């Protein structure tokens, strides 16, 4: 009886959020341990299905770095990283596309469909969904000339074809996007999944952008979770060195999404079961939320 009462309390607490998000788009970047652990995979799929059932329009953008790494190792193709990004030559690009588009994407689509959704797998090449160009990286070091790093076919997003996504949403489908883009000449690019998720969220005018990670959220210099930030305070964390490593591109894409009109961006711990529902539909949420600074 107590358990039933608790469940009822949770549903009542969630009701205002169901109303708030009904008809809205939420973009979720799916990656990390949530893509590997079987119980977390099942929970994620059910979270996405429930979003759809209560009137939310979820869009999933996924990563797949570990899967790419394993396939490159099996094929004896050497891997090189610069500034946290995989240097992508032609052979590596072929493997990236094969793994992300041909395997990981289809596994996620199948999981969602078996859980009761209508999911459709896409890459950025489908309908020129994700337009891209080669990423230019220049590293400046004190007392040294700037270093230009050639990352090969690593790209950055230049545009998103929203008509395709809107059409799928109107017909009740959940888009699942592999972070592979294409330029005007048909060249294929490997793009950081966080950056694709942020660009898609901004282009769609999403209400929320959620990035699933393997950490609790943004941490201060003492390792404590920062639950809420605005853009001004976030820029201070860039400047004082609090943000570093893999958190840098995540926060960067959050700020760009907010600038493009997304209401809130969240960095949450994908290792927590039902993390998507806990973030969106409870009073306290989890992880770190970033909002635009008050003018």
UniProtKB/Swiss-Prot annotation:
- What catalytic activity is recorded? N-acetyl-L-glutamate + ATP = N-acetyl-L-glutamyl 5-phosphate + ADP
Q: What is this protein called?
A: Acetylglutamate kinase
Described by its record, this protein's role is as follows:
Catalyzes the ATP-dependent phosphorylation of N-acetyl-L-glutamate.
Binding positions (substrate): 64-65, 86, 190
Enzyme class at the top of the EC tree: transferase
* GO biological process terms on file: arginine biosynthetic process via ornithine; L-arginine biosynthetic process
Q: In which pathway does it act?
A: Amino-acid biosynthesis; L-arginine biosynthesis; N(2)-acetyl-L-ornithine from L-glutamate: step 2/4
* Originating organism: Oleidesulfovibrio alaskensis (strain ATCC BAA-1058 / DSM 17464 / G20) (Desulfovibrio alaskensis)
């Amino acid at each position: 009886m107590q358990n039933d009462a608790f469940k009822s309390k949770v549903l009542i607490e969630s009701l205002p959020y169901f109303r708030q998000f009904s008809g809205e788009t939420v973009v979720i970047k799916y990656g990390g341990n949530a893509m590997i652990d079987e119980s977390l995979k099942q929970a994620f799929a059910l979270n996405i299905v429930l979003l759809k059932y209560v009137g939310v329009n979820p869009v999933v953008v996924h990563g797949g770095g570990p899967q790419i790494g394993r396939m490159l190792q099996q094929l004896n193709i050497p891997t090189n990283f610069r500034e946290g990004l995989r240097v992508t030559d032609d052979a590596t690009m072929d493997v990236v596309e094969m793994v992300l588009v041909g395997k990981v994407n289809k596994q996620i689509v199948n999981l969602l469909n078996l859980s009761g959704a209508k999911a459709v797998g896409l890459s950025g090449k489908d309908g020129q969904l994700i337009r891209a160009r080669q990423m230019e990286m220049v590293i400046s070091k004190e007392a040294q000339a700037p270093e230009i790093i050639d990352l090969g076919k690593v790209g950055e997003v230049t545009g998103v074809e929203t008509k395709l996504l809107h059409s799928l949403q109107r017909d009740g489908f959940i888009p699942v996007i592999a972070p592979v883009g294409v330029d005007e000449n048909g060249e294929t690019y490997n793009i950081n999944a966080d950056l694709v998720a942020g660009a898609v969220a901004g282009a769609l005018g999403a209400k929320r952008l959620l990035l699933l990670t393997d950490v609790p959220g943004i941490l201060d210099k003492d390792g404590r979770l920062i639950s809420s930030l605005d853009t001004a305070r976030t820029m201070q964390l860039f400047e004082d060195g609090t943000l570093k490593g893999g958190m840098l591109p995540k926060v960067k894409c959050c700020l760009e999404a907010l600038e493009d009109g997304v209401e809130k961006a969240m960095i949450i711990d994908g290792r927590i079961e039902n993390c998507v529902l806990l973030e969106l539909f409870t009073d306290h949420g989890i992880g770190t939320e970033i909002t635009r600074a008050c003018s």
